[in-house]
Amino acid sequence: LECHNQQSSQPPTTKSCPGDTNCYNKRWRDHRGTIIERGCGCPTVKPGINLKCCTTDRCNN
């Protein structure tokens, strides 16, 4: 599986995720605005954080 791993509005980058079946896109707001984190897997998140997990290559941009 290949997942995007750039932060927020950085240019797209990807990484290979051997053994993982999900990519995630996690977003929340703080004093800097909306923060977006992307990566491999499907993490547990705290309330108030918007999480999307998906299962195809580069699906989490």
Curated annotation (Swiss-Prot):
Protein keywords: Acetylcholine receptor inhibiting toxin, Disulfide bond, Ion channel impairing toxin, Neurotoxin, Postsynaptic neurotoxin, Secreted, Toxin
GO cellular component, one term: extracellular region
Residue ranges, annotated region (Disordered): 1-20
Main location: secreted
GO terms for MF: acetylcholine receptor inhibitor activity; ion channel regulator activity; toxin activity
Compositional bias annotation for Polar residues: 1-16
Annotated tissue distribution: Expressed by the venom gland.
Known function: Binds to muscle nicotinic acetylcholine receptor (nAChR) and inhibit acetylcholine from binding to the receptor, thereby impairing neuromuscular transmission.
Family: Belongs to the three-finger toxin family. Short-chain subfamily. Type I alpha-neurotoxin sub-subfamily.
Protein name, UniProt field: Short neurotoxin 1
Species lineage: Eukaryota, Metazoa, Chordata, Craniata, Vertebrata
